[in-house]
UniProtKB/Swiss-Prot annotation:
Organism from which the protein derives: Corylus avellana (European hazel)
Domain of life: Eukaryota
Protein name as catalogued: Non-specific lipid-transfer protein Cor a 8.0101
Family: Belongs to the plant LTP family.
Keywords: Allergen, Disulfide bond, Lipid-binding, Signal, Transport
Thermal activity profile: Resistant to heat. At room temperature no effect in protein secondary structure by varying pH.
Length: 115
C-alpha cells in the first residue's frame, strides 16, 4: 500500500512539473486572423485595425523557428492564391502594423531560411 502511494505521488509530481505544451497556430487559424487584411492587400487604402490585430496575433503565436517557418509557408501559399495581391503591400504589412518579422511576405520567400 505504501509503495502505491509513493508511485502516485511521483506520477503527480511528474505531471505538475511537466512543461505545458503550447499549441502553434494552424494555417486555417492564420488565414482567419489575416482575412481582414485581404482588401487592403489588393487595393491599398485604409488598413483595418482588425487586420493589425490579426498580424500581431500570428506574430505572438510564432515563438519558435518551427512556428515562424510554418507561418511563413502558410503566408507564402496563401499569397499565391490571392488574385490581385499587391506584393509591395504584402511585404510592408507587418511594418504598417508595428510588427517586425524575420522574413518578407512574398510568394518567392524561402521559408527554410527563416530563423
Amino acid at each position: 500500500m505504501g509503495s502505491l502511494k509513493l508511485v502516485c505521488a511521483v506520477l503527480l509530481c511528474m505531471m505538475v512539473a511537466a512543461p505545458v505544451a503550447r499549441a502553434s497556430l494552424t494555417c486555417p487559424q492564420i488565414k482567419g486572423n489575416l482575412t481582414p487584411c485581404v482588401l487592403y492587400l489588393k487595393n491599398g487604402g485604409v488598413l483595418p485595425p482588425s487586420c493589425c490585430k490579426g498580424v500581431r496575433a500570428v506574430n505572438d503565436a510564432s515563438r519558435t523557428t518551427s512556428d515562424r517557418q510554418s507561418a511563413c509557408n502558410c503566408l507564402k501559399d496563401t499569397a499565391k492564391g490571392i488574385a490581385g495581391l499587391n506584393p509591395n503591400l504584402a511585404a510592408g504589412l507587418p511594418g504598417k502594423c508595428g510588427v517586425n518579422i524575420p522574413y518578407k511576405i512574398s510568394p518567392s520567400t524561402n521559408c527554410n531560411n527563416v530563423k
